[in-house]
Amino acid sequence: MIDGYSPVLQSLLGTLLTWGLTAAGSALVFIFSSGQRQILDGSLGFAAGVMLAASYWSLLAPAIEMAENSNQYGSFAFVPAAVGFLVGAGFVYLADQLMPALGFSEDPYSIATLNQDSKPIKEKDEGDLYEDKELSIRIGRGGFHQDKIENGDVYQRKRGTVSPLAEDFSMLNPREAAHKGGSSWRRIMLLILAITIHNIPEGLAVGVGFGAIGKTPSATFENARNLALGIGIQNFPEGLAVSLPLRGAGVSTWKAFWYGQLSGMVEPIAGLLGTIAISLAEPLLPYALAFAAGAMVYVVTDDIIPEAQACGNGKLASWTCIFGFIVMMSLDVGLG
C-alpha cells in the first residue's frame, strides 16, 4: 500500500497484507495448544470490534457522503447505503444457506482423518475405530452437529459410538474404499469452501475501498489503508480459529496451518475484482461500499461473536470487542 500508485496495485498490496496476517495467525498453531481457548475467544472479540468500526468509518460513511454529493437522491441519500447494506448481508446469508445443498449436512468426519490413506482398514486397525472418545470439529457456519458445541470447538462423543469411517470402510474392497476416499476429499474441499466464502466480502471491501479513493473527501488513501489494516487485524485470530480446532482434532500441525492460511487466499482475488468493477461502474460505488459493510457486519454478528461467546469466555470477548472497536475508530479518525 504505497500512496500514488494505481488502485489495482493498491488493492493487490492491501489484500496480500490481509492474507499474510491470516497466515500469521494460523501459524500460532505451532505455539498454542488446542486447549487455550481463552486466547482464541479474546482475539475473536477484538476482531469483531475492529470489523464493526471499519464497516462504518471506512465503508458506510463514505457511501452516504457519495450519495449526498451526487445530488441525485436529495433527502433520500441514505437509500444507496441501506440497499447495499441489506444486499451485502443477504449475500452472506444466501451463501450460508447454499452450504447444505453442496453436501455440508453430512458428518465431516474426514477432517479428523486427513492423514489416512484410502486403502481398506485391516482387522488389526479396526479396534482403533472404537476408542473411548472420538474427536471431531465444526468449522464455519455450516450446520454440522447441531446438538453439539458451537463452531470451531472440539467435541467428544460418548463411548460406544461406531466411527463413520468404520461403517464406510470396514466391509469395502480396495476399489470401493478408494471411491470412498475420493468422496472424503470432496467433502474436505467443500469444507475449505465454507471456511473461505465469508472472506470474499472482506477482500471486496478492500478492493472497493481503494477503488473509491478521491471520489469524495472521506474516500482517502488513508481510509482505504486503515480498512485493509483493520481487516488484516481481524484475519489474524481468524486464521488461528481455523487451524487450532483442526490441530485439536488430530490433524498434523503443518496441515492445520496450511488449511488455516488457505482461508485468506481468496481475498486478493476478490479485492482485484472489486477494484476493477468499481473503476468500470462508478455510479454503483455507494452501493458497493455499503454492500461490503453489510457483508462484514453479518459475518461479525452471525459468526465471530457467537463463536467467541460459545465457550464461557463471553465477558472477555465482549471487552476485547469494545477495545477492538476503539482501536479501529482511533485509526480511522486519527490517521484518516
Swiss-Prot record:
Keyword Zinc: yes
GO cellular component: cytoplasm; Golgi apparatus; nucleus; plasma membrane
Alphabetized GO MF terms: zinc ion transmembrane transporter activity
Broad class of where this protein is predominantly found: membrane
Subcellular location: Cell membrane; Nucleus; Cytoplasm; Golgi apparatus
Topological category with respect to the lipid bilayer: Multi-pass membrane protein
Keywords of the record: Cell membrane, Cytoplasm, Golgi apparatus, Ion transport, Membrane, Nucleus, Transmembrane, Transmembrane helix, Transport, Zinc, Zinc transport
InterPro entries for the chain: ZIP
Segments crossing the lipid bilayer: 12-32, 44-64, 75-95, 188-208, 258-278, 280-300, 316-336
Function: Functions as a cellular zinc transporter.
PANTHER family, per database record: ZINC TRANSPORTER ZIP11, ZINC/IRON TRANSPORTER
UniProt record similarity statement: Belongs to the ZIP transporter (TC 2.A.5) family.
Name of protein: Zinc transporter ZIP11
Organism: Xenopus tropicalis
